[in-house]
C-alpha cells in the first residue's frame, strides 16, 4: 500500500497575553467553554475533563438550531506551557467514538499546539492533520482545505477576546 502524502493545515496566531494564560485557556475546563466553539452563538458544556497526558475530555456543543454535537478529546502530550497534542473525535453522549458526520472526513485528526512568548505576546502555531487517512479521506481533507481556518479561526477570535477579558483589557 502506498503512503498517502498530504500537507497539514497550520494556523499561526499571536495573542496579547502571557503564555501561561494561553496554555491554561487550552487546558482548564473553566476556560475552554468560553471560547472553544466555532462562533459565539454556539454553547458548550463539559461532561468530563481529565486534561492530562493520556487523559480525555468529553463535551457537547449546542448549535443555535438546537442540534447537539458531542466531542471526545484524547490528550497525547501536555508540556506546560509550551505544547499540547490531542486528537478529537465525534462521539455519542456516552463518549463512544462515532464515525465522522461529514462524508469521507478523516476518522482521526491530530492537533498540535506550540506556544512561545516574547514581550508579553504569545505566538501560537496550531497544526491540524489527519492520521493514516484513506485515499478518500485525504481527498476530502484537501478539498476542504480552504475552510480549515474558518472553524478554528472563529474559535481563535473568541479566544483572543476571552483572554483580553480575563486580563481586564
What are these model-derived regions, one by one?
Residues 161-169:
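Short, highly charged C-terminal tails/helix-capping segments
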Amino acid at each position: 500500500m502506498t503512503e498517502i502524502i498530504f500537507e497539514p493545515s497550520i494556523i499561526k496566531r499571536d495573542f496579547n497575553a502571557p503564555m501561561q494564560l494561553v496554555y491554561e485557556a487550552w487546558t482548564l475546563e473553566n476556560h475552554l467553554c468560553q471560547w472553544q466553539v466555532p462562533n459565539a452563538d454556539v454553547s458548550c458544556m463539559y461532561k468530563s475533563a481529565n486534561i492530562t497526558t493520556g487523559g480525555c475530555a468529553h463535551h457537547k456543543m449546542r448549535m443555535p438550531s438546537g442540534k447537539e454535537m458531542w466531542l471526545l478529546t484524547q490528550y497525547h502530550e501536555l508540556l506546560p506551557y509550551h505544547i499540547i497534542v490531542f486528537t478529537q473525535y465525534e462521539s455519542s453522549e456516552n463518549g463512544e467514538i462515532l464515525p465522522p458526520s461529514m462524508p469521507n472526513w478523516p476518522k482521526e485528526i491530530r492537533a498540535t499546539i506550540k506556544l512561545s512568548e516574547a514581550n508579553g505576546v504569545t505566538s501560537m502555531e496550531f497544526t491540524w492533520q489527519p492520521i493514516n487517512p484513506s485515499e478518500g479521506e485525504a481527498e476530502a481533507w484537501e478539498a476542504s482545505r480552504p475552510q480549515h481556518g474558518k472553524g478554528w479561526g472563529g474559535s481563535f477570535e473568541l479566544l483572543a477576546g476571552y483572554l483580553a477579558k480575563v486580563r481586564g483589557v
